[in-house]
A protein has these predicted regions:
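ABC transporter nucleotide-binding domain
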Residues: 173-261
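Catalytic Walker B motif of ABC-type/P-loop ATPase nucleotide-binding domains
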Residues: 154-158
Length: 305
């Protein structure tokens, strides 16, 4: 079942189009990555879904209800976390969370919040003023707020920004557990492609306000046919470079190392040619494509067009 349906969504600011006729859906218990370069597309889309700005054209249905006509009912079952959230700075951590617990009409919100601040390692900071928190501590506070009402739909904009690796891992595991146990649906943005690959079921790429690719992280990675072969030569570096030039390989070299950009299926052919020429390498590493390579390729191609 689709929890979120977006059809032909467009948002213009004067002559500038921030979101350009995009359509997608998010299913129950699914994590959908919304990715793209820095720019207004992702944030504007999230702002529209939160009712913070109105679309120029397009339709949004959440929980099978038209969003505009059912905003209050829908928003009580949603929540979000983002680095640009502004909380009352002069309130203490627990005061901020209690405010949101009451706002969302959460039963037993005090007990719920105590569990959350322990989960996100904020318990010892509960009496600190919000404006005294570090960036990483604020991120954890935003996440506590996001989960306080057990939302059916969660919008997470860079949820692990400013977090140490161990806390980032804790956050990802918590999100995955929520999805598994409560069928929470998550729209997830991040610039950490390894994180996206780990956590997202599907990914949408936005560039200049348009959807330019949509697939699973693995499916998108498979679209990149090239890999990088790193070869180290103690001897005969010059002869190896000459062979690669003669066969018109795309490569670069520095000191004893040669880096070859090559189609993955042709790696065996390359190694065979080196062997026939009796050019022995002391070490080899093969860097297979990742989602980050796909991200860079998409942006490069679109910027050239």
């Amino acid at each position: 079942m689709a929890v979120l349906e977006v059809k032909n969504l467009t948002k213009k600011f004067g002559k500038f189009t921030a979101v350009d006729n995009i359509s997608f859906e998010l299913k129950e218990g699914e994590i959908l990555g919304l990715l793209g370069p820095n720019g207004p597309g992702k944030t504007t889309t999230i702002d529209i879904l939160l009712g913070l700005t109105k679309p120029t054209t397009g339709e949004i249905k959440i929980f099978d209800l038209p969003f505009e006509e059912n905003r209050e009912k829908i928003l009580k079952q949603m929540n979000f976390s983002a680095a640009y959230v502004n909380l009352p700075w002069r309130l203490k951590v627990w005061e901020n969370l209690y405010t949101f617990g009451r706002l969302y009409e959460v039963e037993d919100y005090k007990e719920k919040i105590e569990i959350l601040i322990k989960e996100f390692q904020l318990f010892d900071l509960r009496n600190k003023l919000t404006d005294s928190l570090s960036s990483g501590q604020l991120t954890r506070l935003y996440l506590c707020k996001a989960f306080v009402n057990n939302p059916r739909l969660l919008l997470l904009d860079e949820p692990t920004a400013f977090l140490d690796p161990d806390i980032s891992d804790l956050v990802r595991k918590y999100i995955l557990n929520k999805v598994k146990t409560e069928k929470t649906s998550v729209l997830f943005t991040s610039h950490n492609m390894a994180e996206v690959t780990e956590i997202c079921d599907r990914v949408i790429f936005l560039n200049k306000g348009k959807i330019v690719a949509e697939d699973t992280p693995v499916g998108l990675t498979k679209r990149i046919k090239f890999c990088k072969v790193r070869l180290f030569f103690d001897l005969n570096l010059g002869k190896a470079e000459l062979l690669l030039k003669n066969y018109k390989y795309n490569f670069s070299s520095v000191e004893k190392e040669i880096l070859v950009d090559i189609e993955e299926e042709k790696v065996g052919q390359l190694l065979g040619r080196l062997s026939l020429a009796k050019l022995k390498y002391s070490q080899i590493t093969i860097e297979k494509p990742t989602l980050e390579h796909f991200f860079l390729e998409v942006i490069r191609n679109k910027n050239e067009n």
